[in-house]
Every structure is written in structure tokens, then in C-alpha cells.
Amino acid sequence: MGQGASKIFGKLFSKKEVRILMVGLDAAGKTTILYKLMLGEVVTTVPTIGFNVETVEYKNINFTVWDVGGQDSIRPLWRHYYQNTDALIYVIDSADLEPKRIEDAKNELHTLLGEDELRDAALLVFANKQDLPKAMSTTDLTERLGLQELKKRDWYIQPTCARSGDGLYQGLDWLSDYIFDKKNKKKGKKR
């Protein structure tokens, strides 16, 4: 009896483990976002050569976030981080209006979404640097990134400012809700 109650208690109150792959073009703000979520403050960053991995606890979920560098020469290495990814956070610099960069961001995103190992991963797009005067709106970015074309993938775009933290937790709220909904749907299918 005691052992059964302890198992139920453990399942109710244990933290869910979720593996997140956070990618995007260089200088989009990925590392700033990671450490703002983890430490609650802005840290001085340098371009990520390789990856940073940290655990962010939020809403009884341990998000293990793999922040992988976005330089052109590093992007082919992203595929080494796909395995067991539950969700993808794609960070875009909303104020980078250079057409080639926007096209590169779209192409890289759609390449990721075409990968078999990421077929079940939810997509959260952080439209970062919304505090800058010429930042594109989420509506504009949705169109430019071709998000409306994603019919078989759960996705959400959240305006953010990594430095102030604006929008970051709203994005994690969507991700948390998605994960719990997905978990409950799986339970329902087993019956």
C-alpha cells in the first residue's frame, strides 16, 4: 500500500524532462536567451563555437536546452543534436532586415523541419530583438518564414526581447502547455 502511494506521489510531483534544441542564425540572441532564462540576468556573450547546454526549470519541467552556434560554418553540425529532441526553439533577429539573412533563416528552418529525427518536435519561434525600432512584427515574420505552410507541425511564434526577458516566459508557457497536452493525448490513446 505504501509503495503504491509513493509511486503515485512520485508520478504526480516528479519533474518532466524535456530536451530542447535552440538554433537560429548567428547573432540572433540564442545564448542571451538561454542565460536570461537560467540566471534571470543578461550575461556578456561571445559567438558560440560549438554549444552551451543548461537546464532551465519552469512549471515542474526541466528543460534541457542545447544552444548551438549559428555561424554558417557550424550549421551543418546542427544535425548531431537532433536525436531525442522534444521541441525546437528557433531564434530569429527580428531587426535584421537584410533580405539574404531572412531567406537564410527561412531556408535553415525548413531544412530542420524536414529532418526525420525532428518530425515530432514542436516548434517555438522566438522573434527576438522586438525592442529595436525596425523590428519586424510576428505577422510579418510568420509570412517571411513560411510558418503558415506548416500544416502538420505544432508551432507558435512569440515576440521577445532577450535582454529584458519580455516574451520569454510566455513562449515557455506555450511549450509547457503543448508538452502537457501531448502527454495527456498519449495517455488517452492507450485506453
Swiss-Prot record:
InterPro entries per the UniProt record, alphabetical: Arf1-5-like, P-loop_NTPase, Small_GTP-bd, Small_GTPase_ARF, Small_GTPase_ARF/SAR
UniProt GO molecular function: GTP binding; GTPase activity
Major location category of this protein: Golgi
Assigned GO CC terms: Golgi apparatus
Subcellular location: Golgi apparatus
Any one GO biological process: vesicle-mediated transport
Pfam families for this protein: Arf (PF00025)
PROSITE patterns reported for this sequence: ARF (PS51417)
Gene3D superfamilies in UniProt: P-loop containing nucleotide triphosphate hydrolases (3.40.50.300)
Keywords (A to Z) from UniProt: ER-Golgi transport, Golgi apparatus, GTP-binding, Lipoprotein, Myristate, Nucleotide-binding, Protein transport, Transport
Function: GTP-binding protein involved in protein trafficking; may modulate vesicle budding and uncoating within the Golgi apparatus.
Protein name: ADP-ribosylation factor
